[in-house]
Amino acid sequence: MAFHVMIIPSMNCPSDCSYCWGVDRDSRVMDMETVREMVSWLMEFRNEPATFTFHGGEPLLAGYEFYRDTLKLISERLSFLKPAFAIQTNLWLMTDEMAELFAEYSIPIGSSLDGPREINDYQRGDGYFDRTMQGYEIARKHGLRVSFISTFTSYSIRRREEIFNFFLENGMNLKLHPALPSLKSSDPEEWAITAEEYGDLLLYLLDSYLEHFGEIEIQNIDHFAKSAFLRRGLYVHMLIVWATPSQLTPTVIYTHAIASLV
């Protein structure tokens, strides 16, 4: 059974994406005492390789010192788990110092970009594109691998060709997410797409992917293909979420997680 630990340093986020309903503006940043408690608990829990993913909100809000100390603590005290690390961030707070640290631990980065500037900023807010691209360039300068999640909404799905070409022309790997009905909006379906629309999008991207095979990676399609050939899924079977009590949100619950809160 796959062993995956998701660490949520904060559910706050400096961006204000139109379709996002998982942010908590009052969320505090996780302290090192919480990290130490997590490590102590995990020392008694399992004895097999583990992946630790930092998620949010925006995990970089925790700052450089948090990651310096947390990565060192996990690597040393949980070395028997052969820990690997990953992070999901909008890259706004990426610095050279942070990138050097992540490179030291070979941490792959997942970020979020919905296509060209005009499409992206319409959905995610003015200035989002430029700030994410600035962080992207810092990460690349330090040799970090960055992949992007692109959220397709009722607006952007009509411009799927522009979005695909943007990622193709810029040499960026892509993972697509369908916008889901909001749990907080008075109009929950405003940005959401239907299952039928998502299916049509996958078929379009499969055709485009095959046409440009080897030039771009679309993770969803790769995972479908690997699952078919290997006859086993690539999804997480067991996920432990470590957060402060206020951070168990619908976004976290949605993952079919086994949640361990402090």
From Swiss-Prot:
Q: Where is the Radical SAM core domain?
A: 1-211
**What SUPFAM superfamilies does this protein's entry cite?**
Radical SAM enzymes
At the top level of its lineage, which domain of life is listed? Archaea
Gene Ontology MF terms: 4 iron, 4 sulfur cluster binding; metal ion binding; oxidoreductase activity
Alphabetically list the UniProt keywords. 4Fe-4S, Iron, Iron-sulfur, Metal-binding, S-adenosyl-L-methionine
Residues annotated as binding [4Fe-4S] cluster are 13, 17, 20
Cofactors named for this entry: [4Fe-4S] cluster
Instruction: Give the protein family.
Output: Belongs to the radical SAM superfamily. Anaerobic sulfatase-maturating enzyme family.
Q: What is this protein called?
A: Uncharacterized protein MTH_114
